[in-house]
Amino acid sequence: MLEELLNGNIEKKTITQIYGPPGVGKTNICILSMLKAIENGKNVVYIDTEGSLSIERIKQLSEQDSDELLKSIIIYEPSSFEEQSEALEKIFFLENIGLIVIDGIVSLYRLELCDNINENTKLNRMLGKQISNLLKVARMKNSGILITNQVKDSINGIEPAGGRLLEYWSKSIIKLEKTESIRKLTLEKHRHAKEGENLRFRIVQNGLEIINKSYQ
């Protein structure tokens, strides 16, 4: 799916970010990207911070033997932002990693934000350290990075959560929207592909059905 929009695979050693509201299909796209990496003979790290990953959905979307497939997926389910940091550090010791997925990169971060300035400063430093480690391990392993992000209200409608830090370090940013049963991916930032291109699709039982690709 993302290959259609990016005119190629997810770029290695950099961050590709997909953002959109809950229930719009971000996890489905992550699963398909994960399956693509496994087809290429690689293992995938999947950090699921929101409990969105379904083994049954992986089996539905895959054409491979599910037992063999699951051997190629390393899943972490952190329950705190500190545990998310620990999960990232474990990746340094793994082998043959083709893709690192963090589904909900700032979900736990936002849950722990409070009125205490010192605590929030600590969280911001931790987020910066996570991004640093993520890029470091991806460069070491020659891996792609795919993160999903929540949205927040802004003057222009909605924008990705996480502030300028995630915006700066994400070399590809893709907006995901939903209108009734139709979803739309729009490429907002990319170093090589054409910004503004969009892809409309439907979520079906065995995958995603592309309707059309256009530019606006």
Swiss-Prot record:
Q: Does the keyword Cell membrane apply?
A: no
Output one GO MF annotation. damaged DNA binding
User: Which keywords appear in this protein's UniProt record, sorted alphabetically?
Assistant: ATP-binding, DNA damage, DNA recombination, DNA-binding, Nucleotide-binding
Q: Output the Pfam families linked to this UniProt entry.
A: Rad51
Q: Which GO terms describe its biological process?
A: DNA recombination; DNA repair
- Chain's role: Involved in DNA repair and in homologous recombination. May regulate the cleavage reactions of the branch-structured DNA. Has a very weak ATPase activity that is not stimulated by DNA. Binds DNA but does not promote DNA strands exchange.
Q: Name the family.
A: Belongs to the eukaryotic RecA-like protein family. RadB subfamily.
**In its UniProt entry, what is this protein called?**
DNA repair and recombination protein RadB
The species this protein belongs to is: Methanococcus maripaludis (strain C5 / ATCC BAA-1333)
